């Protein structure tokens, strides 16, 4: 299992330089990958393209970029450019976002979201493979469209998928999933078997499973969880995440956080590896002085 570092999920970053420096520091520490959330700040695909120019080894990915605001050809072109800028180290993570954002803020219809994602991928995937796309659906119609971006070959696409319909789409058409607010029991009983079954039925190889979890190395786990609960409370109010927390049988985001000493963290991460998570994506919560640095250092010892 690879070890990733999530950027932007537990709070805002102060500057573009800060984010790029975090990626450089993660690479220097030995972390395998860095994944950036695309929320209401810097554009994640663009930022990782910049980070790719000043790093050499670390894998880069979005976790995740919403689909609705951008035509699949536009996001394909931007993502392939970032893949080229990073020397082929970029994975495009896409997702639906949430109804409150897509309908309430942006004014798009959020009706039949899984159908939207299926159509989106039917346009996107041929384009990222360097093929000419011809597709006619309810939402997207594309004719004789192709992209040529030298140096971008082999870029993978993962989809934030939680419900059965989305997991089916991700397994059939994409290269895996990127989860958030999903506990280990739900990962083992629902996410991974559903995704693998869909991939197998479509004749695809075992998909990537990138599991995002809040994490902190601390000798005060109860106090840390209190702080994490304050940081992440909003996630527990969003219906798709709430459904996963309910399935896990927990009250809120802090209850799936991994907080404790080295032995506890190591055990929880190895548990996730044993059930099929391919990348542990660490959302390090800076809940006490020095917390981020020592947690990243510990995670780096598990990488590779």
Task: Describe the function of each predicted region.
Residues 1-304:
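Active-site-adjacent structural elements that line small-molecule/cofactor binding pockets in enzymes
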């Amino acid at each position: 299992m690879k070890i990733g570092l999530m950027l932007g999920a537990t709070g805002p970053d102060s500057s573009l330089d800060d984010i790029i420096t975090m990626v450089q520091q993660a690479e220097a520490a030995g972390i395998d990958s860095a994944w950036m959330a695309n929320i209401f700040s810097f554009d994640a695909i663009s930022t990782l393209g910049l980070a790719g120019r000043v790093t050499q080894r670390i894998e880069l990915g979005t976790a995740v970029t919403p689909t609705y605001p951008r035509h699949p050809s536009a996001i394909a072109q931007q993502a392939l450019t970032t893949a080229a800028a990073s020397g082929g180290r970029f994975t495009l993570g896409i997702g639906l976002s949430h109804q409150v954002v897509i309908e309430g803020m942006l004014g798009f219809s959020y009706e039949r979201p899984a159908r939207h994602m299926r159509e989106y991928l039917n346009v996107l995937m041929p384009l990222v493979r360097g093929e000419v796309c011809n597709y006619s659906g309810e939402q997207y119609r594309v004719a004789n469209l192709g992209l040529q971006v030298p140096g971008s070959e082999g870029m993978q696409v993962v989809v934030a998928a939680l419900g059965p319909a989305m997991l089916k789409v991700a397994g059939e058409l994409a290269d895996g999933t990127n989860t958030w607010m999903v506990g280990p029991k739900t990962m083992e009983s629902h996410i991974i078997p559903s995704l693998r079954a869909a991939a197998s039925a479509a004749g695809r190889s075992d998909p990537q499973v990138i599991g995002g979890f809040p994490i902190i190395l601390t000798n005060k786990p109860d106090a840390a969880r209190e702080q994490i609960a304050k940081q992440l409370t909003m996630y527990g109010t969003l219906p798709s995440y709430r459904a996963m927390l309910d399935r896990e049988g927990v009250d809120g985001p802090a209850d799936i956080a991994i907080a404790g000493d080295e032995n506890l963290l190591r055990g929880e991460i190895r548990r996730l590896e044993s059930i099929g998570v391919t990348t542990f994506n660490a959302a390090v919560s800076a809940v006490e002085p020095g917390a981020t640095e020592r947690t990243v250092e510990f995670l780096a010892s598990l990488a590779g």
